[in-house]
Amino acid sequence: MCQININELEAKINNSTKDEFLLELEGTINEVIKISNMKILIDTDYIKIYSQDKEKMKLNKHQIMKIEEKNEEYIISFDSMQKAKIK
């Protein structure tokens, strides 16, 4: 497992050849969301997650503590008891 930054996460997801990703939320909010043709855009305050050119979710990037990569799985840990896994 190694730590990566937001820009590396954006590049790895956007350059991936996978057709479908799972966004798994763990913590205060628990949910599994299937996303087809996932793309990520970074702006001043948010990581915006898109599926087929439609915005699905925004994650506040100022609350991110760290992003880790483990075997094509990305784990985003927030400053609360919340994690988002992208598989």
Question: Which residues does each predicted region cover?
Answer:
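N-terminal helix-cap/turn-to-beta initiation motif at the start of protein domains
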Residues: 5-17
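Short, flexible N-terminal segments of the mature chain
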Residues: 32-44
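Basic/aromatic-rich interaction segments and small domains that mediate binding to polyanionic partners
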Residues: 44-53
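A short, Trp-centered hydrophobic/proline-enriched beta-strand micro-motif
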Residues: 18-26
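Short, surface-exposed beta-strand/loop "edge" segments at domain boundaries and coil↔beta transitions
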Residues: 28-33, 53-60, 75-87
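Structured surface patches comprising rigid loops and adjacent beta-strands/short helices at the edges
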Residues: 38-40, 54-73
